[in-house]
């Protein structure tokens, strides 16, 4: 809860935390009542990355048109309180301003699990990211994510083949 207090002291309009529990579907629904695209910020350590992965797994089935999240990535080993202490409120506002879209975060986080220089690992990555798309409950959102992911895979294939994307 010290992170939330530090964020409030930095001048943020609102900040909440699940207080040591994983983000639940009920908490996600409450966040969406406050904002259609809340920004999630997890600690920049291994536990924070695991929490982010679990949160994404819980959010994907709940996505609806006009409802998503953005993710702000803290520097390695830092939590919000550390960042504010080191960089001041402006540093935290800057971090929030660079929050990534859910589809970008999903792509990057999944890709980081694989050495995509190897064809077998690249195939595993594509399989994993497509699996995430299949977990989206809403048909329209799942279709839109599928189109985006397939476009990124096609771009990656073209880069491997030495074809520049248009």
What residues fall within each predicted segment?
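Short, polar loop motifs at secondary-structure junctions
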Residues: 1-3
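Alpha-helix C-terminal capping segments
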Residues: 5-13, 34
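A charged alpha-helical hairpin associated with nucleic-acid processing machineries
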Residues: 22-38, 42-166
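Short hydrophobic/aromatic-enriched beta-strand-loop microsegments
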Residues: 13-20
């Amino acid at each position: 809860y010290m992170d939330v207090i530090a964020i409030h002291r930095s001048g943020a309009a609102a900040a909440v935390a699940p207080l040591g529990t994983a983000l639940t579907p009920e908490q996600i629904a409450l966040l969406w009542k406050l904002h259609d695209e809340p920004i999630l910020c997890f600690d920049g350590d291994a536990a924070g990355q695991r929490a982010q992965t679990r949160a994404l797994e819980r959010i994907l089935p709940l996505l609806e048109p006009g409802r998503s999240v953005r993710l702000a990535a803290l520097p390695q080993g830092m939590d919000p309180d550390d960042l504010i202490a080191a960089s001041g409120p402006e540093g935290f506002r800057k971090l929030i301003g660079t929050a990534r879209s859910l589809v970008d975060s999903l792509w990057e986080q999944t890709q980081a699990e694989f050495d995509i220089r190897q064809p077998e690992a690249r195939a595993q990555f594509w399989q994993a990211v497509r699996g995430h798309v299949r977990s989206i409950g809403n048909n329209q959102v799942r279709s839109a994510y599928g189109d985006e992911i397939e476009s990124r895979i096609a771009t990656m294939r073209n880069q491997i083949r030495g074809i520049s994307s248009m």
